[in-house]
Design a protein with these regions (language model features):
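Amphipathic, hydrophobic secondary-structure cores in small proteins
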Residues: 15-67
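C-terminal structural segments of small proteins and small subunits
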Residues: 56, 60-85
Length: 85
């Protein structure tokens, strides 16, 4: 079963090739402009960004729905959540 086919992607962002802190800030900014429960498709580099960016997004209250290998990196599907609900 391919669960990605059931999820609607509302926005997409590619932060591969930039410093992980900058990538996280760009992802956070993108999510701030989205509505609750919308899904961000986020492309990140393997390695350290794969451990730090999802952790930081979860700490912000967002939900990582999918983490899978993609061309030259990793594809995440992130559901926007709010810590204050």
């Amino acid at each position: 079963m391919d669960s990605t086919q059931k999820l609607q992607v509302d926005s997409s962002l590619d932060v591969r090739g930039i410093p992980r802190a900058t990538g996280f800030l760009k992802a956070r900014e993108q999510l701030q402009g989205m509505l609750e429960n919308q899904v961000l498709e986020l492309h990140i580099d393997e390695g350290e960004p794969l451990t730090t960016i999802p952790f930081a997004l979860r700490a912000d209250g967002h939900e990582i729905l999918i983490s899978e290998p993609s061309n030259h990196g990793v594809r995440l599907l992130v559901r926007k959540r709010s810590l204050l609900t």
